[in-house]
Amino acid sequence: MFNKDASPRMNPVNPDDALLQRRKILQLAGASTLLCCVASSDLSAADALPKAGINAGDLLVTTRDDTGTPLKASDIKLGGKPLLVYPFDIDTKKPRSESRLNKLLLVRVDPKDLSEEARARSVDGVLAFSAVCTHQGCDVTEWKASEKTLLCFCHSSQYNPVNNGAVAVGPASRALPSCSLAEKDGVLVLASGISAKPGV
């Protein structure tokens, strides 16, 4: 025969205790979500500020160069694809920072097409801009020869290098930040830091 006393007893659940338990779980979930958001925003902020920046006097090396060979104006071809470069610290003999926000692009245009202001920032038609698109932060890597514009493939924003990196075709709404160039001992040197914060 079935013995009622042998069966496990169920304690009735107090609705107030259950509500308190749910609140604790939700508070813990909320706290952990907040902690994750704060941690990821700290990481984004750290990435947004390159450790050593882009400084006047820096040499320029390609992003593929492990030897630290400084670039000359003649290394950038007229009407060719932009060359992606990093600022190179002559004291440490290393790129200042390989943060993507430190990446610059060099492009060469016909000096006759440049305004006086742009010509003053260039060396033999070579201009330097941030390589980070101001729309969503993708790399600007292409040259659209038919339009003579720099092109970001992510959302097809185009920038006019002859017009100080102004937006030629959106969705980007802000010009590419730029740097002035000079020539020293036959190689390209940054004559200024970056004109505005790179990226979005």
Where does each model-flagged region fall?
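Cys/His-clustered metal-coordination modules, chiefly Zn-binding fingers
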Residues: 126-194
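Residue-level detector of bioactive/disordered segments in secreted/extracellular proteins
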Residues: 4, 38-39, 140, 154
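N-terminal twin-arginine translocation
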Residues: 19-24, 33-54
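Short, locally clustered residues in the helix-turn-helix/winged-helix DNA-binding domain
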Residues: 30
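N-terminal pre-ligand scaffold of iron-sulfur
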Residues: 46-132, 139-142, 183-200
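N-terminal secretory signal peptides
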Residues: 1-20
